[in-house]
Structure formats: structure tokens, C-alpha cells
Amino acid sequence: MLYFILMTPKPCHAYYYGGLPVKGTRRKGRLRVEEDTVAFEAPEWKGGERIHLQIPFSKMEKIFLSRDNYYGTDTVLFNLTFHDQAEQSFTLRFAPIALIPRRRMALQKAWFDYLAQAISSLGSASPLSTK
């Protein structure tokens, strides 16, 4: 069981931008922390499959930020690299969202700090990359 001094971030809406072998990109879903896992869910959508993902902290390798310009807005994307039961590596690309920019920045900072701390507490070689 992992114990963190950091406060667990609030569940929030997040956009999925790809990285998994499922159809459909840029879909709105729900991101939350459950005990020692990060959960992401997105419903079925216009030809896209339902996403129900539970990523244990022990399977996470690194998290880094990237920027993209989707639909004319500068978007900060989280890139969470993890491996599944078959030891295949995936990079989940998502962005926590809030309507008010100041709150969105605070929300993104809280989630990034929490995930970086969770990964680094497991003793990974390079838990945080600021590519």
C-alpha cells in the first residue's frame, strides 16, 4: 500500500487524445484516483469504443508534458507511459479540463504533481521528464 503526503487530486473531466489501441480520439471522459490506481473512463462515442482503464501506480513508468494546438487553442497534454499485464508499453495522452483557465492550470498542476510524486516514490529511474 502506498501512502502519499500529497493530497489526492479531485476527480475531474479529461479529454483523451490517443495512445491506446482503441478507435476514436479526443473524447471526453472522467479521471480519478482509486486507492493505488488511476482510473480513466470514456463512454462509447460515434464509432469509438468505450474506454475503461485502471492503471496501478506500480505499472506507471513516467509522465511528461507536451503542448499541442488542437482547434486553435494551446493545449497542455499529459503523456502517461505505463505497461499492461503483457508488459506492452502504452502512452496515454490526456488533458484534465476546467472551463475557467486559472482553475484549469491549478487542476493540471495538482494532477501532474500528484502523478509525478506517485511514480517517483516507487523508485523509477526517471519518473519525471519535462520534454
Residue ranges and their predicted role:
Residues 1-36, 103-104, 110-113, 128-131:
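Anionic N-terminal interaction surfaces
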